[in-house]
Structures are given as structure tokens and as C-alpha cells.
Amino acid sequence: YKWDMGWMNDTLHYMQTDFPWRPGNYRMLTFSSMYQFNENFILPLSHDEVVNGKCSLITRMPGDYWRQFAGMRALAFYQMTHPGGKLNFMGNEIAQFIEWRYYEGIQYFLSEQYDTHRHQQRFVRHLNRFYNEHPTLWQRAFESDGFEWIDADNADQSIISFIRRGDDPKEDLVVLINFDVNAREDFRMGVPEWGVYEELFNTDNERFGGSGVLNTGKIKCQDEPWNGREQSIVVRVPPLGGMILKKTGAQRRPAKKTASSGAAKAKKPASKAQGKKAAE
């Protein structure tokens, strides 16, 4: 195994970039897919990134407190859904503001005294549990057939989406991450299969300190090609957050009208006289 220092540097550089300038740095999010399966990579957010004046992870996030914590959730979510192993240094799970000092302990009292840090700790706990309970995220973490882009070109909106595949095709997961501060209503995205989808995880859940832009209930496919897929769905996209969707049910697909069927309906049947003449 090898630490993917390229992923770490590109990702942290992108996350430190203020929101208006993120579209111009979009390729820092997607470049890792050019080499991510060349070796067995581990995605490190280690002690090296929070010492010697580099500051803690959360203090690198642009914006006010809410956006900084939302950025921390988006970063952790991106790391967890990205192919490869995961490495996190202690203190990341509570979003400690001071960088690590070898002569001091981690400030775990923050999660006891402040809701924002408690929400962050709860988020990381639930994200870790979700990861463990969904083998799709780790069964093929080092194999190219375990990952497929849906959209790696939406720089203007700072959104990426992809598919994670495991050993069971029925357990495939669709991941979307929005690195912009604006929520998106009625956002259309292509999906790999026709059917009914449900949201399994959303970083913007209010219990994690989010704003509550969720997708509740069933999400039905529409016969509208999108992102190179034959079908698509319309979802709510959380601000500075991500979500995981899964196909959970079947749905009857509407019959497509063809040119031949339309011509057949338009053609008038021959009259009896015409039929008799043809027979002669």
C-alpha cells in the first residue's frame, strides 16, 4: 500500500480555495482518477497536515463557521466514497481548531461543550458505520471496475457524481457531492439503471449540523437521457454536501414510440375494391 500524496495535496488545495474560484480548480477533484488504480493507494489526512504552522483542517476551510463545518463534512464524505484506503489523524473527527501539538492532548471537550463539534463527531461516527455496513464502498476499492464516473465535467456548479460498484450489482451506489455553497433544487442527473431510487445518506442532515436539504421518499426515473445515460432522476442537492443513492425498486418503463409504428398508424387500410383488383 502507498499513501496517495497527490490526492491529499490536490484535495486540500481545492478545499482551501474560496468558492468563486473553485470552478477553475475543478480538475484537482478529478485528476486522481487518472492514476488511482495504478497502485494500492491510501487516502491520507494525517498528522503531517495539521502541524508546523499548516493549521488544522477546519481553519483551512473558507467561509463562516457553518460553511467551515459543512466543508469538513464534504471533505470526509469525499474521502470515504473515493476509491482507496482511508487514513485520518485524531482530532479530525471533532474538527479541532488548533493544530496538533505533541505536548498537548486532543481537545475532546469541544464535542461535549459545543454543538458544532458534537455534530461533527456524530457525522463521522455515522459515516464510518455506513462505510462498514456497505461493502460496495470497500470490496473493490483498489480495482478499476469498482468506480465509474457519471459526471466529471460540471465545473461551473462544482459538482461531481460517480458510481461505486461492489461484488453484488444490486448493491451499486450512486454518489453526488456539491462543493459549492448553493443548494440545487430540481437537479437532473443520469443514473446507471432504470428503476426507483432512494437516498441512503446525506451530509446535510440536521442531526449532523446541516441545513436539511434532503431527498425523502421514492425517486422515480424519468425517460430523459442525461450524462450519457438512457435515464435520469431529479434530486435536491445539498449545499456544501454529498449524498448517496441506491436503486431500491423496479419501475415500469414507458414504451417508446418508433417511426415505423407511427407510419403504420397513419397508413389507411386498402378498400375492398383495391384488394379485389390486386387479387386479379
Segments (PLM) and residue ranges:
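Intrinsically disordered, polybasic Lys/Arg-rich low-complexity tracts
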Residues: 252-280
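C-terminal accessory region downstream of the catalytic core in glycan-modifying enzymes
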Residues: 106, 112-115, 119-121, 127-129, ...
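C-terminal beta-strand-rich structural cap/linker in extracellular carbohydrate-active enzymes
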Residues: 216-254
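Active-site rim elements
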Residues: 58-69, 107-118, 229-234
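Acidic/aromatic-lined carbohydrate-recognition and catalytic surfaces
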Residues: 174, 178, 227, 240, ...
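A short small-residue
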Residues: 100-108
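Aromatic- and carboxylate-lined catalytic core of secreted/periplasmic carbohydrate-active enzymes
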Residues: 111-149, 241-244
